[in-house]
């Protein structure tokens, strides 16, 4: 399904083309899965300034943040973190790393929203095409290409300025694209500078800066060959005051630095083997550096923690179309390989005691191999798509002889496993306007570095965290059925889904009584058993031109309701309250327009929380108003007033472990934003 925001200027339908769900160019109405699309137009019209805004109007999709490092992961239908595969230009992003404290963490994704062309969200298991980590879905970001600025010309670009009062952020973006012969190029840069969120709490002073540089070269060698080079550099920095029990004068500095470089080759080979071959080779390197300064008594302490994730990825795909009698076949098959290393070094400097150096995860390495095959079979109005994939993975903990966590080096072992996953999807075209779709899909997720090897010894305080290389891979099976309607004034979708998950991995206390030294608690990541998630989603978009005396009115509405239980029939806290978004648009023929959005989120009651100590949250209704004006063809001015009624509310993902009220975690109060963008 396309983006469920309330947007003006463009009436979208299910004609939107998606790639990620099937690895083919398919219109949404012909896709046997629930797929959402956010376009660059949607991002502009909603005045999105960060990942925390990107999915705000999309029921069933949310983000999880922490107060120090910001957005950490994306939640789809109650599944999040490393259970959601995140791609940027086809490149799988680094693992989310949660250290158990605020000193060092690594987010699942870092991308600037000004440089996004489209985001595809595949809801539900998708491992048969994309392998491990897609057990709960996929979020695929596509950055802008030179052609998006050139628009048939030899030169183009934009200059953009934005200010947002919610965190006093100024952002500037510039893009330059050029075409010389068959070579197209793009250089784009975005800079953001801001402060702490202006919410209903009393947040300490903080400052943030973000830099994103995107470079692309695309060369059409001839009719059969196209080569593309891309580079993406990100550097984000945050400084702020912190609070730790027993410490004073605590401050932090967090720096994220990421490089992504790749080459892609598209070959229209037109042979018996395949009609086309697409392959890409990419290198991704990400480093998180967290520095914490604090004072306790006479001791001045500095924690300098580093987490690195670096590796290569290769992906290839062959496409082949065949017509056999009364059936049409579209085959997609290929292979993938990845090799990456993880490093974590935590240094502690003390003025009045000994310095320390520890790690949460040893310097480990991982290799993954994958083979996949899919056949899209069309017979008349019926399309059925079977697919299968094989994956193998190997993880090596490296040298753990200097392990300072209190665990023996023999506790860290190599890990390897393999898995087959399948998918069967179908679409039945009732007529030109109505379609039914259904799919059964399997998912799996190999244990990640953190789950296999995380360790930390603190027996003096009554606990030791031990590695567990005996984990099993998580697996799932998902069922979905839906109906779509699409015509020239309206589009609708209703889908119901049910997913079973097995061998879920979570951290648990496996023994011990939390008695310091003599009987500390032993904690590990373990396979805890089963979980079930089910729900229903609905959306509708309608142009009112045939019903109103004045043209330009349209509306959109979307809702998502999800339930989740573990194997003991206890509610899953990762499932968000049900959500409804309604938007009403008016676009004048005089180059201006406005949008009113109402975003309702239900309460999270104690009966829906698997912990009596966690605080429930109240329902909230948030109203946003945006408007645009084009004084000349290439200049667009926008203004927005958000949370018009100054509603005090929480994002459930951010407070689902909270046992006492903390208004520092509330969302922004009434705030405003302005944007000016000039295209040339």
Locate predicted features.
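Gram-negative outer-membrane beta-barrel transporters
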Residues: 378-384, 393, 491, 497-501, ...
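C-terminal beta-signal and adjacent terminal beta-strands/loops
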Residues: 444, 502-503, 507, 603-606, ...
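Outer-membrane beta-barrel signature, preferentially recognizing the C-terminal barrel domain
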Residues: 247-272, 307, 360-366, 412-421, ...
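Flexible loop and strand-edge segments within Gram-negative outer membrane beta-barrel domains
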Residues: 194, 200-201, 206-208, 224-274, ...
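Short loop/turn motifs that connect adjacent beta-strands in outer-membrane beta-barrel proteins
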Residues: 9-11, 130, 146-155, 182, ...
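Acidic, small-polar-rich N-terminal luminal/periplasmic segments of exported/outer-membrane proteins
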Residues: 10-149, 168, 481
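Signature of Gram-negative outer-membrane beta-barrel scaffolds
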Residues: 328-434, 457
């Amino acid at each position: 399904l396309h983006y469920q925001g309330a947007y003006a200027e463009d009436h979208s339908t299910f004609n939107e083309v998606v790639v990620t769900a099937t690895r083919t160019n398919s219109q949404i109405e012909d896709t046997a899965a629930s797929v959402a699309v956010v376009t660059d137009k949607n991002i502009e019209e909603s005045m999105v300034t960060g990942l925390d805004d990107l999915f705000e109007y999309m029921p069933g999709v949310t983000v999880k943040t922490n107060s120090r490092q910001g957005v950490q992961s994306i939640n789809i239908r109650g599944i999040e973190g490393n259970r959601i595969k995140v791609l940027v230009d086809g490149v799988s992003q680094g693992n989310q790393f949660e250290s158990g404290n605020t000193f060092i963490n690594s987010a699942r994704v870092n991308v600037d929203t000004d440089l996004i062309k489209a985001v595809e969200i595949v809801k539900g298991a998708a491992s048969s095409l994309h392998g491990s980590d897609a057990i709960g879905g996929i979020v695929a970001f596509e950055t802008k290409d030179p052609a998006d600025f050139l628009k048939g010309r030899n030169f183009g670009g934009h200059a953009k300025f934005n200010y947002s009062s919610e965190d006093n952020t100024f952002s500037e973006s510039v893009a330059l694209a050029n075409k010389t012969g068959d070579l197209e190029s793009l250089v784009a840069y975005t800079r953001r500078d801001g402060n702490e969120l202006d919410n209903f709490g009393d947040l300490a002073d903080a400052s943030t800066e973000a830099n994103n540089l995107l470079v692309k070269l695309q060369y059409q060698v001839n009719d059969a060959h196209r080569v593309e080079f891309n580079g993406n550099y990100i550097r984000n920095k945050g400084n702020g005051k912190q609070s730790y029990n027993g410490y004073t004068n605590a401050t932090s500095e967090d720096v994220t630095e990421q490089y992504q470089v790749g080459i892609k080759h598209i070959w229209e080979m037109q042979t018996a083997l395949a009609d086309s071959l697409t392959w890409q080779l990419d290198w991704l390197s990400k480093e998180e550096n967290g520095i914490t300064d604090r004072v306790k008594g006479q001791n001045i302490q500095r924690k300098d923690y580093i987490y690195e994730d670096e590796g290569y990825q290769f992906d290839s795909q062959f496409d082949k179309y065949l017509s056999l009698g009364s059936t049409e076949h579209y085959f997609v098959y290929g292979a993938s390989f990845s090799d990456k290393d993880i490093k974590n070094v935590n240094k502690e400097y003390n003025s009045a005691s000994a310095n320390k150096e520890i790690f949460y995860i040893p310097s480990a390495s991982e290799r993954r191999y994958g083979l996949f095959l899919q056949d899209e079979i069309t017979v008349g109005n019926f399309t059925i798509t079977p697919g299968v994939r094989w994956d193998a993975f190997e993880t090596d903990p490296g040298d753990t002889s200097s392990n300072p966590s209190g665990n023996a080096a023999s506790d860290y072992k190599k890990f390897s496993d393999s898995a087959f996953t399948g998918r069967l999807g179908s679409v039945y075209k009732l007529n030109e306007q109505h379609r039914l779709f259904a799919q059964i899909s399997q998912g799996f997720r190999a244990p990640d570095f953190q789950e296999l090897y995380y360790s930390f010894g603190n027996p003096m305080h009554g606990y030791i965290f031990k590695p567990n290389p005996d984990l099993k891979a998580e697996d799932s099976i998902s069922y979905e059925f839906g109906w779509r309607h699409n015509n020239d004034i309206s589009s609708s979708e209703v889908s119901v889904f049910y997913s079973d998950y097995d061998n879920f991995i979570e951290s648990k206390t496996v023994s011990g009584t939390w008695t310091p030294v003599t009987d500390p608690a032993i904690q590990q990541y373990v396979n805890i058993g089963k979980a079930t998630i089910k729900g229903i989603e609905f959306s509708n978009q309608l142009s009112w031109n045939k019903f109103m005396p004045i043209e330009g009115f349209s509306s959109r509405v979307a809702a998502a309701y999800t339930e989740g239980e573990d194997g003991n029939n206890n509610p899953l806290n990762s499932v968000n309250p049900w959500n409804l978004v309604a938007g009403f648009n008016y676009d004048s023929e005089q180059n201006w327009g406005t949008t009113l959005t109402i975003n309702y989120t239900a309460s999270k009651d104690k009966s829906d929380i698997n912990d009596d100590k966690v605080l429930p949250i109240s329902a909230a209704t948030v109203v946003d108003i945006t408007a645009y004006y084009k004084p000349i063809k290439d200049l667009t001015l926008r203004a927005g007033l958000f949370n018009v009624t100054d509603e005090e509310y929480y994002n459930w993902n951010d407070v689902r472990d909270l046992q006492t009220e903390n208004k520092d975690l509330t969302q922004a109060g009434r705030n405003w934003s302005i944007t000016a963008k000039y295209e040339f």
